């Protein structure tokens, strides 16, 4: 929403050489600033005590003991409730997703509603004649024993696969479009912005969004679209944290405490999605809270929520194997120093993947906004049909991505040369015919290229969509293809561990698309338990990060989406060239000198009128408080600053009718205690910030930026010799910073408009051919 200054007839100060940042509101880098409310972290810290003090005083006699007990237990009750709900939703998502995916290939003989894991839970191993916990790659025994019925025939399985894929995608996109539009996409970018101090639309973390995201996400994944659940898991987990804290801590919730709960919940979302609790905690530190100080309190809350959430998930046991990890992989053959060049090559691939896939995805998002925004449902149906049609004939694309990676990560032969896996990938040796080798190698390469392209066009469609697992799937097929070449032409069989190459490739692409390092390393270890490959993994991730850094990419896909969508976000410090440019400008040039001010003494009726008039006309969000004796002066002295939301809350607490409001005086410089029992007088001193952050006119913009980032304030007063000159807001300085970047370096993202028009012409021609008859009428 607009900044806190508005034009009035009598501006304060001369306003010479002021840069009007509002004229740049419509540039892409700032297009959605008005959808966010800047949070004044300093002012928010005092809100609960000041606004609720009267109510607390009146009720303290009756609620004292209950409140003491609640005060001691509320943190753990809130954290535990949040974690348990997140764990339950994660268990539901896993079971529901697997059920829908399995329906595309068969059904349970005794109960159609059971997925393959539950249906085959009691399968008897023909070798040991014992009932084992089902392992992903032992499911063929379930079919052999008649517990699971696969679709038979040559055409029927294909038709069922296609129909269910399109149906699942259709239901998912309809739910998002017509019921909860905020449930679309990943949600990580918006959460990062929210945590950094810019509050988004309340519906984004609302109950309806939580429900639809939890239902539409498994439908989208089951449709076969190249989307993952990890990003949306962060979103639904954050919804849980937000809703439960608002409900349980509504009387004492401040921004800083809410930030801690939201960060902890987001980390738990990653923890339950990957089965990686420590990785989830690190994700909250490295990704979500990167623009904020991650203190020990936040770290502890993140740890506790991840612990309880993952314990809840283990109790539910959605995989029916007693574990919470996606892949049960063990590598007992150590790596060799001679393999380091190959590890470096995998890291280079991960860096290039992150660079180009994010770039192409951003270009396609621009194309979608320009030409496809009116047909979101049709776009999803087309993508689902295309994906299913291509994937059906390739094993590594047809399978669910996590199941496919389970195959690719698996170790074929142990150190004693005994086979642990019967997949055809493990039947290749020096005696394998070249045609068979090329068939599997080509299948892996095809899956790599097609999956990467599908990620480009699928991420951002009108369904819940993550990009972590699809990127890992691309890296896994590439890494396994590389291992085939190494075994065939360099090392020979039984020397390297092919599954480890898939594992390292997945880590490379995950790091490439997210630009995360420590988080990726820990998540990959928790996913697989492959601790023997810690050094190769660190090499791969380091090389990936080096490639991204040398390419000028400083953030992952979430950070780039923030810029693409024009969200406000206080980025890390600017480079030297940008800092030198900003040093030339001062607060005087950036500030707004046209303000609405409030005198320290004012009638309640005037205050109400000013409050609601500003709401309708200007959407002002704060007011400087000035001395009474300066009421008719051009130069005013500022004694404080009050947020509009605090002012509205305080006025609502007053039991004053409209007639009495005309004679009731409000004192911003006195409290009710100071006024005593004076009739028709109210003290508002408790909601006024008596020491707002202020600077001189000559302060450089670079210093202002650091103040906003480190202090977390919403506005900074510009004064000179005690005289109020203007205001600078966080959005002002962000607009200015991005404007100057655009002037010096050009647009952050450039698009080939001519190519977009040609592509749209082709698409439009095809659509027209299939939707009109010979007479030109729509079919």
Curated annotation (Swiss-Prot):
Molecular-function GO terms, alphabetical: voltage-gated chloride channel activity
Protein name: Anion/proton exchange transporter GEF1
One Pfam entry name: Voltage_CLC
Topological domains, Lumenal: 97-154, 199-203, 286-296, 358-369, 458-465, 524-529
Annotated site location: Cleavage: 136-137
Cited InterPro entries: CBS_dom, CBS_dom_sf, Cl-channel_core, ClC
Ranges facing Cytoplasmic side: 1-75, 176-177, 225-264, 320-336, 391-436, 487-500, 553-779
Lineage: Eukaryota, Fungi, Dikarya, Ascomycota, Saccharomycotina
PANTHER family in the record: ANION_PROTON EXCHANGE TRANSPORTER GEF1, CHLORIDE CHANNEL PROTEIN
């Amino acid at each position: 929403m607009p900044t806190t200054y508005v034009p009035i007839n009598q501006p304060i100060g001369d306003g010479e050489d002021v840069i009007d940042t509002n004229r740049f509101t419509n540039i892409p880098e700032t297009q959605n600033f008005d959808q966010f409310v800047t949070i004044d972290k300093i002012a928010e810290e005092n809100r609960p005590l000041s606004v609720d003090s009267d109510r607390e005083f009146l009720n303290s006699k009756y609620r004292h003991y209950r409140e003491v007990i609640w005060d001691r237990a509320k943190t753990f009750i809130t954290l535990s409730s949040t974690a348990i709900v997140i764990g339950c939703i994660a268990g539901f998502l896993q079971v529901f997703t697997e059920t829908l995916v399995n329906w595309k290939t068969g059904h349970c003989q005794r109960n159609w509603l059971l997925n393959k894991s539950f249906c085959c839970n009691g399968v008897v191993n023909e070798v040991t004649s014992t009932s084992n916990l089902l392992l992903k790659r032992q499911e063929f025994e379930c079919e052999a024993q008649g517990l699971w019925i696969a679709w038979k025939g040559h055409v029927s399985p294909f038709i069922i696969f296609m129909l269910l894929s399109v149906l699942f995608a259709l239901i998912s996109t309809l739910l998002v479009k017509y019921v909860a539009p905020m449930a679309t996409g990943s949600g990580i970018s918006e959460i990062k912005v929210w945590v950094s101090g810019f509050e988004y639309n309340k519906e984004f973390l609302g109950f309806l969004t939580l429900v639809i995201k939890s239902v539409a996400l498994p439908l989208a994944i089951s449709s076969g679209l190249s989307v993952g659940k990890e990003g949306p898991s962060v979103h639904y987990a954050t919804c849980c944290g937000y809703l439960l804290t608002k409900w349980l801590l509504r009387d004492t919730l401040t921004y800083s405490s809410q930030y801690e709960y939201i960060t902890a919940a987001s980390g738990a979302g990653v923890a339950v999605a990957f089965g990686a609790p420590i990785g989830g905690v690190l994700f909250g530190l490295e990704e979500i809270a990167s623009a904020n100080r991650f203190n020990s309190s936040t770290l502890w809350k993140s740890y506790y929520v991840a612990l309880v959430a993952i314990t809840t998930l283990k109790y539910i046991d959605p995989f029916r194997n007693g574990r919470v990890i996606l892949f049960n992989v063990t590598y007992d053959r150590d790596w060799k120093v001679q393999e380091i060049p190959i590890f470096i090559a995998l890291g280079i691939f991960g860096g290039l993947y992150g660079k180009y896939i994010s770039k192409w995805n951003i270009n396609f998002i621009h194309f979608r906004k320009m030409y496809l925004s009116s047909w979101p449902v049709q776009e999803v149906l087309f993508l689902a049909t295309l994906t299913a049609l291509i994937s059906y004939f390739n094993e590594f694309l047809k399978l669910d991505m996590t199941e496919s990676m389970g195959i690719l990560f698996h170790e074929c032969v142990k150190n004693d040369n005994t086979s642990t896996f019967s997949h055809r990938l493990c039947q290749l040796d020096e005696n394998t015919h070249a045609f068979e080798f090329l068939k599997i190698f080509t299948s892996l390469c095809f899956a790599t290229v097609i999956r990467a392209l599908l990620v480009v066009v699928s991420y951002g469609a009108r369904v819940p969509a993550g990009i972590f697992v699809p990127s890992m799937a691309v890296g896994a097929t590439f890494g396994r293809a590389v291992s085939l070449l190494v075994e065939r032409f360099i090392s020979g069989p039984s020397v390297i561990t092919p599954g480890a190459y898939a594992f390292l490739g997945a880590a490379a692409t995950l790091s490439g698309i997210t630009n995360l390092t420590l988080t990726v390393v820990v998540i990959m270890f928790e996913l697989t338990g492959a601790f023997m490959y810690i050094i190769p993994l660190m090499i791969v991730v380091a090389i990936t990060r080096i490639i991204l850094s040398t390419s000028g990419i400083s953030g992952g896909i979430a950070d780039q989406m923030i810029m693409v969508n024009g969200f406000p976000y206080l980025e890390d410090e600017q480079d030297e060239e940008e800092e030198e440019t900003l040093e030339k400008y001062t607060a005087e040039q950036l500030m707004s000198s046209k303000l609405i001010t409030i005198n320290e003494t004012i009638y309640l009726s005037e205050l109400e009128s000013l409050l609601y008039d500003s709401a309708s006309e200007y959407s002002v969000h704060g007011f400087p408080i000035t001395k009474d004796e300066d009421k008719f002066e051009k130069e005013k002295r500022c004694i404080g600053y009050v947020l509009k939301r605090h002012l509205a809350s305080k006025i609502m607490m007053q039991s004053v009718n409209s007639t009495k409001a005309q004679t009731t005086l409000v004192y911003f410089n006195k409290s009710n205690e100071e006024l005593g029992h004076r009739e028709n007088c109210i003290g508002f001193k408790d909601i006024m910030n008596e020491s707002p952050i202020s600077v001189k006119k000559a302060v450089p913009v670079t210093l202002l930026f650091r103040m906003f980032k480190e202090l977390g304030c919403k506005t900074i007063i510009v004064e000179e010799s005690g005289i109020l000159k203007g205001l600078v807001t966080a959005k002002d300085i962000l607009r200015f910073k991005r404007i100057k970047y655009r002037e010096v370096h050009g647009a952050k993202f450039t698009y080939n408009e001519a190519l977009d028009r040609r592509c749209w012409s082709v698409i439009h021609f095809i659509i027209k051919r299939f939707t009109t008859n010979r007479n030109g009428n729509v079919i």
